[in-house]
Amino acid sequence: MNKVIEWFYNFLWGDLFTLHFGDVSIGIPLLVLLLIPAGIFFTIRTKFMPVRKLPQMIRALGDKNDDKTSLSTFQTLIVSTATRVGMGNLVGVVAAISIGGAGAVFWMWASALLGASTAYVEGTLAQLHKKKDPLYGGYHGGPAYYIHDFVEQKRKKKLKKSFLAILFAFFGLICWCGISQVISNSVTSAFKNAFSIPPIYTTAVLVALAAVIVLRKNATVKFLDVIVPVMAVLYFAVTVFIILKNIKLMPGVFSRIFQEAFGFKQIAGGGFGAVLMNGVKRGLFSNEAGSGSAPCAAAAAEGKRPETVGMVQSLGVLIDTIVICTCTAMIMLLAPREITDGLQDRKSVV
């Protein structure tokens, strides 16, 4: 099983080919090859929407929801943020900086801006192709739905099913089940390492909590409405406290980020590719732009205008990477180097 997982990981994140620029080598994984050009294309086509319409993104959170069976734009942001924020914001950032240096943080920011454009397109398409749920009320949808609709448009006839939509739904199910296992495994490992609690007990508590939330109608959204803002604010507050305690070191931290992102030392040493790719890969893994998970939440929103829901999804990417990942990066870069050098696995965070 481990060999199968390792093969899939190398297929998706291993170097598909390598670009050589003098002494600099940049390995390009398959997912980076797919997601970064898509992000650049969407950014240009939307005329740099994440930067241009940031005020409108924030104002869109105040839109009222007249249909109580569907989600408001704010609730879709909460749900999509809950899907985006996870181990990538902690372990991913630690690994990116440990392997690629402080300069990887800059390339995480850059990938977030491209990912925000992708998320905008995903969210807007999910709204345009959402379906009314006759059983539970509200709406449902996502990439499988708009892929199916596009196949119908291409073939110019109604279809009961389409192979591409089924393929996406199948691999999406595998992906999201796997992600939840990664998170639960990290939680059980953390409690075992910190408090010597056997994983079976932590797992039982997690299953019980999940059952209480999932089996009650609308309990998932209500729970996330409370827990996501609280956790984000607390994490941000802790980071601000640490920054204020070390405010004199901040100019050096930002100088280190930009120097190592574009530094001649990294280029001359052939390490520029590691800085660039580790920042980009960890940024893409963290914000999930292009993975197809967040559009399912976007489709559940009432949304008077599809564009508004798309902008809120774009804001979710910026919150995930520009805010939360940066918090982790600042905490790590303010710590003494002898503590942080070489930390590449989840135990370094625990």
What are these regions (language model features)?
Residues 1-87, 97-104, 115:
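N-terminal alpha-helical transmembrane segments of multi-pass membrane transport
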Residues 34-38, 42-58, 164, 185-191, ...:
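Membrane-interface loop-to-helix entry segments
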Residues 84-90, 106-118, 167-178, 315-327:
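Membrane-embedded alpha-helical segments of transport systems
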Residues 224-305:
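Acidic, glycine-rich loop-and-beta core segments that form the ion-binding/anion-interacting portion
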Residues 38-43, 111-139, 148-185, 189-213:
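Helix-loop-helix module between adjacent transmembrane segments
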